[in-house]
């Protein structure tokens, strides 16, 4: 560990295999001082795509994993940290996408950058967010949707809680969550808080052999935006295509970002329920359509973003999205 800390401090990059080995040491027997020194040195140097992928592999190695018997699993987990207090976009979008027939293995945690994270809002609507891995696996196989709470599936992360809190700055662990789905999702929509992270995370996903993914940053949001342009890196096998999309490209209209503001877990839970049942419309519904449509598209169920949006709309209007919320609550 000391050798790796010295190398990173000197500005040397680690290989993917070395980063994986370092992550294993961090989780198993590194001291808090060593962990803090390593994370600080990596932050100062700047983490490479290979290092990020290697750390993700090490985190996956230490995780409690599941393998649901479902083809084409999709995750909609973002990094958080965009400093906008919006409604719970990725969580609600996952439920709507499931209503459109996309099998969802949703990975998430409590709030990072808003007053209500995926775990906060799902707990508020009545989901058993602390379900054990075998139970979540069964739920995904039966209902086509399940939620995996990060602390339940990644207990080894306890080793880095102290150093991260004491450092008080972003580290590589702030971006690893979306790369470490415990169900080994085949495809995902991954939102990032910084547009500079779009190509970096896309390359990391390619190194991790994801089948298909969209890495997105929407004009300040770690989501696909309806208030402006979204930068996208689409990963397909080893190919990465970068492009931008606007609300109009998806058959939607541009909205004010203030119109998608969130609130407390109780308020966001009410919005989630209202959107999936069709009672909440306007901008809040539109941003869910945009992001659920992306999940439907990346799953291969729709051929374009716009077609995905239309299928998301149909999932809400038919009651299928509300049925998936009921399945998740009743699991």
Curated annotation (Swiss-Prot):
Its EC number is 2.4.2.18. It comes from the Archaea. Mg(2+) 1 binds at residues 90, 223. Binds 2 magnesium ions per monomer. It is an enzyme of class 2 (transferase). InterPro entries: Anthranilate_Pribosyl_Tfrase (IPR005940), Glycosyl_Trfase_fam3 (IPR000312), Glycosyl_Trfase_fam3_N_dom (IPR017459), Glycosyl_Trfase_fam3_N_dom_sf (IPR036320), Nuc_phospho_transferase (IPR035902). SUPFAM superfamilies: Nucleoside phosphorylase/phosphoribosyltransferase catalytic domain (SSF52418), Nucleoside phosphorylase/phosphoribosyltransferase N-terminal domain (SSF47648). 5-phospho-alpha-D-ribose 1-diphosphate binds at residues 78, 81-82, 86, 88-91, 106-114, 118. Its cofactor is Mg(2+). Mg(2+) 2 binds at residues 222-223. It catalyses: N-(5-phospho-beta-D-ribosyl)anthranilate + diphosphate = 5-phospho-alpha-D-ribose 1-diphosphate + anthranilate. Pathway: Amino-acid biosynthesis; L-tryptophan biosynthesis; L-tryptophan from chorismate: step 2/5. GO terms for biological process: L-tryptophan biosynthetic process. GO terms for molecular function: anthranilate phosphoribosyltransferase activity; magnesium ion binding. Keywords: Amino-acid biosynthesis, Aromatic amino acid biosynthesis, Glycosyltransferase, Magnesium, Metal-binding, Transferase, Tryptophan biosynthesis. Anthranilate 1 binds at residues 78, 109. GO terms for cellular component: cytosol. It holds the Pfam family Glycos_transf_3. Gene3D superfamilies: Nucleoside phosphorylase/phosphoribosyltransferase catalytic domain, Transferase, Pyrimidine Nucleoside Phosphorylase, Chain C. Anthranilate 2 binds at residue 164. Catalyzes the transfer of the phosphoribosyl group of 5-phosphorylribose-1-pyrophosphate (PRPP) to anthranilate to yield N-(5'-phosphoribosyl)-anthranilate (PRA). Homodimer. Belongs to the anthranilate phosphoribosyltransferase family. This is Anthranilate phosphoribosyltransferase. The gene is trpD.
């Amino acid at each position: 560990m000391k050798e790796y800390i010295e190398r990173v401090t000197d500005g040397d990059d680690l290989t993917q295999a070395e980063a994986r080995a370092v992550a294993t040491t961090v989780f198993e027997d590194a001291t808090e001082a060593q962990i803090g020194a390593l994370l600080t040195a990596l932050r100062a140097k700047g983490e490479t795509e290979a290092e990020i992928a290697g750390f993700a592999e090490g985190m996956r190695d230490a995780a409690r994993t599941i393998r649901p018997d479902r083809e084409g699993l999709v995750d909609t987990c973002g990094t958080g940290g965009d400093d906008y207090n919006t409604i719970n976009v990725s969580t609600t979008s996952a439920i709507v996408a499931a209503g459109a027939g996309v099998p969802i293995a949703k990975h998430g945690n409590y709030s990072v950058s808003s007053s209500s994270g995926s775990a906060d809002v799902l707990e508020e609507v009545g989901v058993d967010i602390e379900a054990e891995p075998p139970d979540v696996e069964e739920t995904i196989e039966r209902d086509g949707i399940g939620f995996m709470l990060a602390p339940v599936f990644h207990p080894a992360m306890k080793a880095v809680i102290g150093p991260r809190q004491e450092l008080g700055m972003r580290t590589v662990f702030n971006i690893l969550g979306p790369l470490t789905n415990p169900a080994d999702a085949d495809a995902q929509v991954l939102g990032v808080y910084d547009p500079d992270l779009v190509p970096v995370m896309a390359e990391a996903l390619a190194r991790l052999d994801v089948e298909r993914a969209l890495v997105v940053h929407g004009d300040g949001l770690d989501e696909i935006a309806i208030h402006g342009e979204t930068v996208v890196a689409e990963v397909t096998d080893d190919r990465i295509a970068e492009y931008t999309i606007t609300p109009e490209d998806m058959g939607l209209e541009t909205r004010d970002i203030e119109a998608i503001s969130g609130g407390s877990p109780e308020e966001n839970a009410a919005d989630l329920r209202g959107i999936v049942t069709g009672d909440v419309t306007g901008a809040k519904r539109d941003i869910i359509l945009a992001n659920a449509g992306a999940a439907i598209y990346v799953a291969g169920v729709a051929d374009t973003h716009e077609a995905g949006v239309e299928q998301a709309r149909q999932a809400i209007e038919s009651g299928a999205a509300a049925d998936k919320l009921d399945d998740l609550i009743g699991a």
